[in-house]
Structures are given as C-alpha cells and as structure tokens.
Amino acid sequence: MKLEHPDRLMNRTPLSLAALETHDAFAERHIGPDAASQQAMLDTLGFASRAALIDAVIPASIRRAETLPLGPFAQPKSEAEALAALRALADKNQVFRSYIGQGYHDTHTPAVILRNVLENPAWYTAYTPYQPEISQGRLEALLNFQQMVADLTGLAISNASLLDEATAAAEAMTLLQRTGKPKSNVFYVADDVLPQTLEVIRTRALPIGIEVKTGPAADAAQANAFGVLLQYPGVNGDVRDYRALTEAIHAAGGHVVVAADLLALTVLTPPGEWGADVAVGNTQRFGVPMGFGGPHAAYMAVRDEFKRQMPGRLVGVTVDAQGKPALRLALQTREQHIRREKATSNVCTAQALLAIMASMYAVYHGPHGLKTIALRVNRIAALFAAGVKQLGFATVNDTFFDTLTIDTGARTAQVHEFAKAKRINLRRVSATQVGVSVDETTTRDDLADLLDVFAQAAGGTAPAVDALDAGLAGVAALPAGLERTSAYLTHHVFNRHHSETEMLRYLRSLSDKDLALDRSMIPLGSCTMKLNATSEMLPVTWPEFGRIHPFAPAEQTVGYREMIDQLEQMLVAATGYAAVSLQPNAGSQGEYAGLLIIHAYHASRGEGHRDVCLIPASAHGTNPASAHMAGMKVVVVACDAQGNVDIADLKAKAEQHSKDLAAIMITYPSTHGVFEQNVREICEIVHAHGGQVYVDGANMNAMVGLTAPGQFGGDVSHLNLHKTFCIPHGGGGPGVGPVAVGAHLAKFLPNQRSTGYARTEDGIGAVSAAPYGSASILPISWMYIAMMGAKNLTAATETAILNANYIAKRLAPHYPVLYSGPGGLVAHECILDLRPIKETSGISVDDVAKRLMDYGFHAPTMSFPVPGTLMVEPTESESQEELDRFIAAMIAIREEIRAVEEGRADREDNPLRHAPHTAAVVTANEWPHAYSREQAAYPVASLGTNKYWPPVGRADNAYGDRNLFCSCVPMSDYA
C-alpha cells in the first residue's frame, strides 16, 4: 500500500496499524518516478494511465491473464522483513571449517577491500568498461590483475578474468584446438585434474567433436593429443616436476595447459618457466569467499603467440588525445559481439568485480606478504603430515604445497565422524582415503584439532604442534628442485600500498575516476542498468553464505538449498516455464546450456541429427557464438524494414532445413526494442518443422508480470539475473544466467555428477564448476523479488516501458527513433538513429558518446544492433528528473551538431570531435579551440553543482591494438 502524505494525515482520525504498515516501501524506493511524475510522463505520451500504455505496447495475444503466481512471495516484504526471512534461511546453514580443497579454500578478505570494493557501489554498480575514458579506475585494477597473473604464472600475457577454473580449462582446450595439432581431435586430461574441471571439459568437448582421454600424466606424450591438461599441484596434493614431460609433449606436436594454484606459484617454479603454453586457474583464495561455489575470478595466461586467440576481456595500454597513457579493452575483434559465430568464445560478462578483489589482495599484501602466507600454509601442511605419520597413518603424496591425501583404511569413517564432531569437513577421496587441504585461515589451534581427529581415529594422543614445529626446524617442506627463484610482482603498485591508509586512498583514487550508477544513470540498451539496492547486497557478505564450501555435505547447506529452491520457483513464475537451473554462472553459459538441452531432447527422440539453428540477423553476438559452441550450424533469418523477423524468410528457411531444424533463437522483445506482433506465429512455424524455440531472456525486464516466454511458445530461455533481477554488473561481472525450460525439457537440466549433484538421470553435463554456479549472489535476486512482490514487480516492468517511451517521445524531434511498434511505441528501450547526422555534419556516434561524458553520462549502447545508432534503456529505477537531465543533454548535443551542420562551428574544431574534455585540458594555459572552455566543460547549467571530470582524453583504440601492451604502466609514463 502507498502511505498518504504526512501533511494529509495530521487532521484525520488515527489510521489503523494495517494502514500504516509499509510493506510496499521498498517498491517506492526501487521505482524512480513517483505517481505525479508518472502521470506527467503519461500526459506527454497521451495516455491516461500506465495500464492504457501497456495495452497499447504489448500485443493482446500474449498478455498474461493472471497475476504473477509467486505463492508465499506474492505480497511484498519490507526490507527488515525480507532480511529477517533470509537470515532465518542463512541460520539453517552450518559453517564448518572446510579442508576439502578441490579448488576452493577459505580465505581472509582484508577489511579495507571488503568495505571499499565489494560493498562499494562505485565498484559494483559500474558497467563493463567499453567506454574507457570513464572507466580508468577499474581498467587499472583489471590491468593489475593481468600483471599479477602473468607474473605468478611466468607467462607473457593474461586476460582480465574468466568465469571459473573449469570453464577456463575448457576455453583453453578450444583455444588449442584452433591453433594446435591439425590432425588430432584428442584432448588429454591428467587423472589428477579437479573432477569438476574434467566434467565441464567433457560437456564442452562432446558437441564439437573433441575426444577427451584421461590417464596418468606420464602417458600424455603418447596420446597423440593436440593439447594436454595438467594440474599443478594435483587434486590429491602431489607437486610433480613436469619439465621433461612438457618437452616430450611439444616434441610430439602437442601443447600444454596447466591448471595452477596462484598461491602455490609464489613458492613453486611457475608453469611458464618449464614450458607450459597456457595456464588457467582460480583466484578465489586471494581474498574472495568460497560462497558455496562462486562467484570467483578465473584466469587464463598464455604464451605471446596465443594472445590474439584468448577468450574474454583483455585490458591494454594506449594513449589519449593528448598523448598521455590511457587504458582500454584491447583486441575486441576477438569477441562475440563483433565476430559472432567466429568469436574465440561466447563469454560476454566475466568476473570483473572478483578479479578486482583478487588483484587488490595482491596489491595489499605485496610479493613478500603473499609469499609469507604461502610459506605459512605450506608449513602447516608439513606439520600436519609429520603429525599424522607419528600417529601411524601413511600419506599418499610425499610432495605437497597445502594438500595431503591420507591412507586411512578401515578407519576412514571414524576420521570423518570425529571431524564432524569438531565441525570440520575433510575431502572424501575414497572409502580408504581422506584429503586435507589447509589454507590461509588455518591456525595452530585448527592444526591441533585436525591432529586430534586423526589421533582419536588411531586411538592415540595427538602430538603437540610446538613439538612438531621444533622437530622440523630447518627441514624444507617444498619439493626439491621446484622452489621458485624468479621475482614476481615487482611493479611499484604491488610494493607501495601496504598500509591501510595507502590502500584506502588508492582504492578511492581509482573509484573517483569512474562513472557508475552511484553518480548517474547508465542508459545502456540491452543491459538493464537498474538500481542494486543496498539491502539486497547486505546478505552477500554474511559468513553463513560466504564461508560454505561448494562440496560441503548436504546437511550443512539446508538454508542455501531452500533459498535456491525458492528462487527457482520465483523464476518459474516469472517466465511461465516448468523448471529452472541456477547452475550457469553467466548469461552466455545459460544460453549454451539451453542449446545443449535442446540437442539432448532431440537425441532422446532419435533425432540427434537436428543441428540447424535459425538466428535473426539482429541477434546479440552471443547467440551465434553459443550455437557454434553447441555444435550447431547457424542459418541467418532476415529482418524486415521494421526490424521484425521476416516471416516469409523464416518460413522458407524452416521449410528448407525442416529435417535438420534444431531450434530458432529469438530475443523478446526484439533487440530492436519492439514487441513483435507475430511472435506466436514465429514459434508455431518452428514447432511445425520439429524445432524448439529458444527465447533469449536478455530483455526480460520488459516482460515480468505482463507476458511470459513459456506462455507464448518458448521452450527454453536463459535469464540474466544481473539485469532483470538486480544482481549488479560489477564492472563486467559477476552475473548469473539461469536456464528455464518447459516441462518436456526439465529432465535435461544440467547435472554435476562428479561431485554427487545429479538433478536428473538424463541431465546434460555440468556447465559450471560448482553445482549451483555463483550461489553467494543469489540472495540479491531473492531479496529483490521478496521485497517487491507480484504487484510491484509488474509495476516495475510497466514503469520501465513508460520511461523508455517518454525518452523516445521527447527525443524523436531531435533524433529519429529507428524502430517502433503500433502507435510509434517502443518496449523498454529505443534506438536513436544518428546515421543522418553523420551524413550532414561528419559527427559520428562515437563523437556523441564521448561528448555525453562531458555532460556526466555514460553513453547508451553504441552501434548495436544497428551501426551508427544509440540504443537507450533507462530502466524503472530512474526518476523523471534524471530522465529529463539526460534528455536535456541529448538535445544540447543535437544543437551543437546543428551548429556544425549550419557552418557556425567547424567540422573538426568543435566540442564533439574533441570530447571528452579533461580538467587538465580545460585549465591549461593554452586553449587552441574556437569554442569556449565553458562550452567544453559546462555546456549546461546543472553541471555547475555536480561535475564529473573524465580522467583521460579520448583513447586511441587503433594505437593500442597496433602496439599491444597489457601490463602495468611504469610510473615514468605518467610524468
């Protein structure tokens, strides 16, 4: 309910408690325009109500008849109520000390990083840094990440993160397939690789015809493989010398991928120094909580010859318009939004926020601090090994960094029983072996407890830690010949910010350079940059969610699994499908999973030959990239002059490929920002030819509560929880990409059999390293839905559509709106056509994007889905005041363009061509331009009270790609 204005309450009979309870208060905070503003915008559009507008925008044939069936979450909860309800679920989890290892370790997040990065909206509400001039802070943090990874792995170049270690290993496999031994389709995986990694590799390999072989690492050179994956150290703790093996693999024409533990590499010889071609791994133990599996930033580092084949983001150094160093995303032509089915990967969002945390962990500790942590971890492992041997147990591995595998024989069950009594988790290697992985958080008291567990099982007394320590004095605990001797993290950034004062100021200096949602709206079309409310973010840092190992026993994760089940049902209600899996940890992975599910469905019906995927020409680049990865052949369907799917062309191609048609991938509303009237017909055509309908859920923010893909003909969709359901973009990740399916596809949802998570017997293999993907950020979406309730979720969708149409209407006299539906209306976004301006003035869409920075705005999406256009999506969270500020900026820019068109301003020397303008340029002694300094920096009066200064001038992208440099910049370059 809405509260009446306090002034109107003063002279009335006291209201009841029910009338005063503010369950809807959060919705009023989340939805930007108040009732008066909404009515004013509706008046501008010529509609009496929001309902009338929605009736005109959305085809009646697909309108949802019923209210969102959210069950117990239909009524909104207040922020306090939602937090209390989620706290009750969190309290059902049991936080044990987990020494399971297997790629996940407990860690200490330095408080200065927790408060000033993870909990700071300046970092977590930013977008992927496609606009480099207003992204220099996070680009520098990601460049630090790349430098950290390259240094620790001993390889030439690293990317700016991948989704998790398992998918990074799978990406390495396909990288080597593209570049490696031409006559082999074999990828060899050593038998001590993490089991979840092997499962994801098998999932990825099957549809593209790669044969995965496994066996002892020693046999790899004889496998005739184009690539070999080694684990360093191995899952059971062994640290092996792979130098001779690597030489033999190279001699046989293969390449070597090493999955390496970065903390171990501070004390072990790095893979790059013994011949590895690619290194992959996880940076989770660099200050990022386990979080029941994620999100965490994986990495990939490669030899120089592979740099142009790497997947994911790559930050590079270039110069700006004044010749000063500037950072930007390099080699973007590798990526799916440009190369589509020929891209190096379908990865779009990665794990930027977590990569930034990991890089700052290295900055804070520095090389000496990291090595001290590593040596302490290794020392504890050595003392544990000595202690269990004294108790009569044998260790399977004699070499180790942090992990021991113990032969426990008939006493295995007792060991686990005694460990459970002390709230300790150990790895269940087999019926006769137990694994123990210690970490940064392991103390001498923890070590004493571990030893006591084994002592109880042995019927003896645990040796004292101090006595063990004294007995091992002078004894090297690392394997002989593999101690690291090379320097790392020598750049000044890793050797300066070690006091909290310095670290705090460094983080502040970086965040001040960037433009995120905490400063202004980010009207990126197809990106849904909406409010990420603080109350939604709070539970992410609760230890009951953060300190849970993804492979912890089920009885310890009851609350997590209840929350996940509830969220899945919420998404079922929103989409109209029958079932949802939250395992995919990005939209790209949900999309890929959906296509594998379609293939599994066809195969189950004896139609595994169906491999043609129809994709409209307007589709997002991930669609064809994912289809290619899923082993499908992409056939493009034309769009008509209004931007809709060309029905005649669709019918012709569906008929042509009828016997082999697997699916069509459509986006709804379309990527042109319109509710296509004939979407049901599209679905019926494909179904008539035996295909399945994949509805890309990127634009779900225009559908929640009003229509549903599962009700108008969709068979499968992925969603973007980092768009519609309020998980923040984090500067380029994390994201969550659930896959939602109809009842006939539910049994094919992804499993993770290697770790005991089998959802259904017929499910596809794992698409992420952890059973529930990025589980620790799922509470964000749970909180959002719980606080909004059914009615307000629908109101949010309606307001997003209202805001988009208001912008389109106000800007149409200045910039043509390229596509619209009946009545000239759009969905939740609109495309502004700047191509005529280019013809009349020479001003490009890039010039307008850069000029918006001077006005304090991040540009809308550039040149997608149509080159030379801007796609604007305001979301429901922006107030009319902010919308009007953006509209005023766009109109002012149009007047600046008109001055060029009319000859009042020079075609080259004008504010657009030289944008953005830095404070250094505006305040310099020399001002060489015909326009004034005031016009450059303060083109509208509102900037006088709230001015954002871009830290660099326009970045030279071509220079950066010609002179590729992806490491930290020497201080001298900034002089």
From Swiss-Prot:
Listed cofactors: pyridoxal 5'-phosphate
InterPro entries: GcvP (IPR003437), GDC-P_C (IPR049316), GDC-P_N (IPR049315), GDC_P (IPR020581), PyrdxlP-dep_Trfase (IPR015424), PyrdxlP-dep_Trfase_major (IPR015421), PyrdxlP-dep_Trfase_small (IPR015422)
Catalyzed reaction equations: N(6)-[(R)-lipoyl]-L-lysyl-[glycine-cleavage complex H protein] + glycine + H(+) = N(6)-[(R)-S(8)-aminomethyldihydrolipoyl]-L-lysyl-[glycine-cleavage complex H protein] + CO2
Keywords annotated in UniProt: Oxidoreductase, Pyridoxal phosphate
EC number in record: 1.4.4.2
GO biological process: glycine decarboxylation via glycine cleavage system
Record function comment: The glycine cleavage system catalyzes the degradation of glycine. The P protein binds the alpha-amino group of glycine through its pyridoxal phosphate cofactor; CO(2) is released and the remaining methylamine moiety is then transferred to the lipoamide cofactor of the H protein.
Assembly behavior: The glycine cleavage system is composed of four proteins: P, T, L and H.
Family the UniProt entry places it in: Belongs to the GcvP family.
Name by which UniProt lists this protein: Glycine dehydrogenase (decarboxylating)
Organism: Burkholderia cenocepacia (strain ATCC BAA-245 / DSM 16553 / LMG 16656 / NCTC 13227 / J2315 / CF5610) (Burkholderia cepacia (strain J2315))
